[in-house]
Amino acid sequence: MRADARKNYDLLIEVARDVFVEQGAEASLRDIARRAGVGMGTLYRHFPNRDSLLEAVLRSRFAALTARAESLLLAADPAAALLEWLAESVAFTHQHRGIIAPLMSAIDDPESALHSACVALRAAGTSLLTRAQQAGLARPDLSGEELFDLIAALAWLREQPS
């Protein structure tokens, strides 16, 4: 990638991250391009659709949550590690309003731009859950899919009007 193209790509990611946090996942792509100081053509050259932009924005955060889960696998208390990761995951969903519907549909859609990021996030939580279950500190009948659904449900509740 040319240096100027890379600069625009990185700038679009940075601006989109802020706009998605401020306005939610359905924020205007035109607003993102305007705030980044680029044209719509530049945005679409890098990101052909909203899902690809959202996936790029979320990729770094998912990687951080995955890395956090991996580091928590070494924690002395598997239940506390699982709860800490769960709290961080829920906090992330609260920062990014409107991502739950796309995430829940992407987890089952291998064609979605968000699919691989969702699968990695669920696998990270499943590893922590399995460790807590093996220590007898979590219900043995709870699955990684149900844990992912719990995160989604908590985020969905947060998005509902009071």
Description of each model-found segment:
Residues M1-R34, S52-E55:
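Basic, helix-initiating cap at the start of DNA-binding domains
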Residues G37-F47:
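Short hydrophobic/aromatic patch on the recognition helix
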Residues N8, R61, L65, L86-S89, ...:
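Hydrophobic/aromatic residues within well-ordered alpha-helical segments
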